[in-house]
A protein has these predicted regions:
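Short cysteine-rich clusters marking metal-coordination/redox-active sites
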Residues: 7-10, 50
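A short beta-strand-turn-helix
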Residues: 19-38
Length: 123
């Protein structure tokens, strides 16, 4: 972790090589104000394909950061945000650039490399 960029105020690492957990309070802050692309996994704890993809998504953070911020949003806990973005099936990956959704993919990816390749293809 010592190799990545650090916060100018608290000096903690900005990227931790694992997905950031988003909630209602942090979603707009990270999506709307980010100067780098943000890849969000919309998921739920009861979803089998979501659980199957979780390790690959975790590994994808290490492949994509710091060029892309990787985050997760639990649609059960944050139903209003899921409704706002018309999430109809999970898992759904959405890529945001400058606060705007630029790509979306419903369904589970098998590998971190597949997630990284899909993400990079939309930048």
């Amino acid at each position: 972790m010592g190799q990545g960029p650090n916060c100018g105020h608290c000096h903690q690492a900005l990227f931790e090589q694992h997905p950031l957990t988003l909630d209602a309070a942090s979603f707009d802050k990270h999506i709307g104000r980010s100067h780098i692309p943000v890849l969000v996994d919309f998921w739920a704890p009861w979803c089998g394909p979501c659980r199957m993809m979780a390790p690959a998504f975790e590994q994808a953070a290490g492949l994509l950061e710091p060029q892309v911020r990787v985050a997760k949003l639990n649609t059960e806990d944050e139903q209003a945000i899921a409704a706002r973005f018309h999430i109809r099936s999970i898992p759904t990956l959405a890529l945001f650039v400058n606060g705007q959704e630029v790509a979306r993919q419903a369904g589970a990816f098998r590998t971190a490399a597949d997630i990284a390749e899909w993400t990079r293809s939309h930048l």
